Amino acid sequence: MLHRGIKFVHVAVLFFAAVLAFLFIRELDEDGVLGNSAVIFVFDSEDSTSGAQVARSIASFAEDHGVTVAREVPDLREPDGRRHLYMTGGEDSSGVSAWLNEGYPEFSSSLTTEVHPIADIGQRDPRGHYYVFGPPEAAESLVAEFSGLGLRADVSHPLSGGELITAYTNSVMYWSFWVIALAAVTLTGASVLLSARAYGILRLQGFSLVDLLVRDLRQLLAPWVVALGAVTAVALTFLGFYNGFAWLSLFATLATALAGLLLLLVLTTHVAVIALTFKVDVLRAVKGALPARAASVGVYLVRIPALLLALSVATDVAQVARDMETRQENRTAYAEAGDAVTIRLNGGLSGEKERVIEEIGPWLRRADGNGEVILAGRRDLQSLVPGSQLPPGEVLIVNETFLTEQPVLDPTGQRYMPVAQSDRAASGDRVQLIVPKSLGGNEAALTEAVVGVLGPDFDSRTQLDVHLAKSGQSVFTYNTGNQVYNAAHSQKEDRSHVQDPVLVIVPNGSQFVSDDGYTAFAAQEGVVFPNPDDVVSAIQGNRLGVYVVALRPVAQNSALKMREVVTEFRVQLFNLALTVTVLLIAGVGICAIYARKNSQAIFARHINGWKYVSTHRFILGVEVAIAFLLATRVPFEAWLQNKDLERIAASGTPLTQPLVDLTELDLGIIAGLVAVEFGAVLLALALFHGRIVREGATEV
């Protein structure tokens, strides 16, 4: 009979291929529109053609070339959950034009796509993303068409194999695939080795390598067909409820390709390990003997990469777990923000920075002066004052409305409030610099930092008041900070609450913040509108729709990022579980090979009174060395990296990445990984030793 482990691997491969295909296509659908052959990004315009003229030209081009072209536009009020496609009509080889009547087949349930005729796009600025459905070469022709209309554009093929590999290499799902492959290969090899005695008996009956493989494949056929039917039925049932079988052929193709690749690796391993058993003569093979040296080398070739992978995944799990905990703690603050929104600026206008600043900056200043805005700009403290030896931290550039919404306490526990109108009338507009008490004595360097973030008309000698704040305060900033560099944190971390920030408080709508500053803060989600209608009114009344393409509710944005982190945590936890399983299988396998090779010596040493540790000193020494390397590798690498970063910081150069901080959670996960790995080997070795002692060397 075929070993149960081999049957399990083939069933598991089919299941995990379907899961990976689902997750991958869902992510593709959320990142862009499926089914396209090319994406054209129009990034510059001579403003010689109106949006309606561009739409008519696109419709004519699509009809002449037999393709469909669609312009993607984010929803103004719900950009992360809804998008709009403005499509050309007519017939094309892809059949995509039917979406105008039937709607877009959404694979992901988290995103709604509304389809409109391209004529409905009106006078919208033509800069943005256009999808081409049809022959890929049509995209170059469309770029030439755009050029004739005074538009500059680039072409990409995000769904092509090369660009997908580039985009997803080192992603979580990429490593999930290889973790699954490693687990499948390990379990297959172990199962074949455990069947060495059965293969020896079959060899004694005259079976060749090919005969053994054909026999195994024949025995796999029935369970494989049953598993394929079960996985197909479950997948169809799930997809029917989830998205009404949207993109079913794409899902089936990808799942089949992934399953085929995994099965190829499994079958290659199967053949290789059977061939390995032929290195032992038939009579010894009948007794269960293994090619110990070759088998041990093979196991360690799997085990060492698995150890390194497990360490990497374990540290990722710890990092994502901390991030998830932080985001969970911040949910209350975001809920209290209510309907507040930030704005998303048009990325297609990156080549017209001055024009954007001229339009957006004054509008934001007026809105700030009218009390419609909470300003929450951020800057990295060390980058503002290089060479000052200040510790890592953040400077928050906020307005007085921010001060009324978020409490900031002085050293006595009293809350700072905006300057009274009567005091302002007497002394004029002034900037308040609030410094944490822990940074007291650095006023000169911090004043220099203030000069670096405010407009050129600011005079720190006559327009700046410096105050101290209570140390240990955490200030909510309305955004995660991932758009702003910080020397102490990675961009993936949630920095919605900043510990002991330096606050620069400017009067609402004052000239201390330049138009460029307002625009930059808005692009970094640092300009918050408590009432979304204020933005909508400004867009409609001031024709700002060219520059502001969407509103982003701060609470919804936080919830979406929380969902992404939870999904990543689950996948990473799954990867960790699989890598630990591989380590356990490999650890038990090395003990089994060792015990079979040395059974007679172990039995002889036992009856001669050798101590357990002395009997197994070689394998125990190897395992202790592996456990030591496993336990110290990450801390040692962190120490080396921090030494280099500290040397850079001592020279006064701002750090390009934060210092590595190993928390108790990191060390606990590493210690647990070492304990599981080393404990499994010790337990397996003790079991094999006991069996040899009880039953004699020939019975192992």
Model-predicted segments: where are they?
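Hydrophobic alpha-helical segments
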Residues: 157-280
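Selective transmembrane-helix segments that form parts of the transport pathway or gating/packing helices
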Residues: 7-13, 210-236, 255-265, 298-305, ...
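C-terminal membrane-exit region of the final transmembrane helix in multipass inner-membrane proteins
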Residues: 191, 196, 259-292, 594-597, ...
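N-terminal membrane-entry
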Residues: 162-181, 252-257, 559-583, 666-672
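Interfacial "coupling" helices/loops that link adjacent transmembrane helices in transporter permeases
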Residues: 186-221, 586-624
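Internal/C-terminal transmembrane anchor helices
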Residues: 11, 286-322
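Nucleotide-cofactor and metal-assisted catalytic machinery
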Residues: 2-160, 320-569
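Short helix-loop junctions at transmembrane helix boundaries
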Residues: 231-258, 560, 627-674, 686
